[in-house]
Amino acid sequence: MLDTVRVDLPGRAYDVRIGSGLLPEAGGHVLPLLKRPRVAVVTDETVAGLHLEALRAGLARDGIEMSALALPAGEATKSWAPLERTVGWLLDQKVERGDVVVAFGGGVIGDLVGFAAAILRRGVRFVQIPTSLLAQVDSSVGGKTGINAAQGKNLIGAFHQPSLVLADIDVLGSLTARDFLAGYGEVVKYGLLGDLTFFEWLEQNGPALAAGDKGARCEAVRRSVQMKADIVIRDETEQGDRALLNLGHTFGHALEAATGYSDRLLHGEGVAIGCALAFELSARMGLCSQESPSRVRAHLKAMGMKTDLHDIPGDLPDAACLLDLMGQDKKVTQGKLHFILARGLGEAFVTSDVAASDVLMVLEDALRSK
């Protein structure tokens, strides 16, 4: 069971290989990239405890030596001090420009390690081995790397494409139900932004996906990655179409900031709630029928996911403060906030023509329900 999606960027093309049993075969996939048989792996402590020795064995089968650094798990690792620690460790390992760094973990590790690779010796190659559903379908593909700032999420970073992505769906079996469903928020996003047929497939197959059906998981990852690859090829540095991939993120990032990037709200949970709010805003503006946000929420609820602000534990700031947090989003251009809205399921578009009063009303209604 192996699917390959080619991200066909001029001069920087790479494969995303999706399947079962890729970790034990990692050496065979990575070896053709190496000038000498060694790699530096950066992971987090949770993934290290579960999968690091399997990766070491998979690399050793092809004679590849591995050194490893395990950072604390969690969003707080996506910040300056862990970045400095990672770069310092890579320099201590004497990683050369011709070597390969491996990002082995979820979205936090992929973003951090990709950024470290981008700035180390002005750019070394790296391989993504994503271990969460969110990372497999989204953050490991497309070359966005970076860290968070006190002022907002993903505000410091670089575009740096990986040389290879290995998405082994077997490792998804070690995720908690909450982490798996957080990643599913990004999967649903793809159907909502541009593929109604995929969303309908998810409505039918989502429960099997969550229950561990390998065929369904492979298909969901493949379709998500293919859609992202197609968009990235058209617009690598987010000058146009790539912004569609931020459906749900303008609201979601503000909610993450409001909860202090803590365990109260995982990134994918914020995206799922953000998608529901984006469709609510679209309906309020008369762009789509009220049936669209209702159907989005119905599917998320059926999957046991967070769908509304009342699903977030603890207090939240008021609507005006949330709107101000949205203004820190990296999608602001000339002081104007860009929204990804929709004319219906699978029909998203980018616009800055949104009245602040409409956004405030949607947020106030959502907070009232809390």
UniProtKB/Swiss-Prot annotation:
Annotated residues for binding of Zn(2+): 186, 249, 267
EC number per UniProt: 4.2.3.4
Pathway(s) served: Metabolic intermediate biosynthesis; chorismate biosynthesis; chorismate from D-erythrose 4-phosphate and phosphoenolpyruvate: step 2/7
Keyword field contains Amino-acid biosynthesis: yes
Pfam name, any one: DHQ_synthase
Keywords for this protein: Amino-acid biosynthesis, Aromatic amino acid biosynthesis, Cobalt, Cytoplasm, Lyase, Metal-binding, NAD, Nucleotide-binding, Zinc
Main location: cytoplasm
A GO cellular component annotation in the UniProt record: cytoplasm
Reaction equations catalysed: 7-phospho-2-dehydro-3-deoxy-D-arabino-heptonate = 3-dehydroquinate + phosphate
Binding note for cofactor: Binds 1 divalent metal cation per subunit. Can use either Co(2+) or Zn(2+).
Localization per Swiss-Prot or TrEMBL: Cytoplasm
SUPFAM superfamilies: Dehydroquinate synthase-like
Enzyme's top EC category: lyase
Entry cofactors: Co(2+); Zn(2+); NAD(+)
NCBIfam families xref list: aroB
Database matches in PANTHER family: 3-DEHYDROQUINATE SYNTHASE (PTHR43622), 3-DEHYDROQUINATE SYNTHASE, CHLOROPLASTIC (PTHR43622:SF7)
Protein name: 3-dehydroquinate synthase
Species for this entry: Roseobacter denitrificans (strain ATCC 33942 / OCh 114)
Gene: aroB
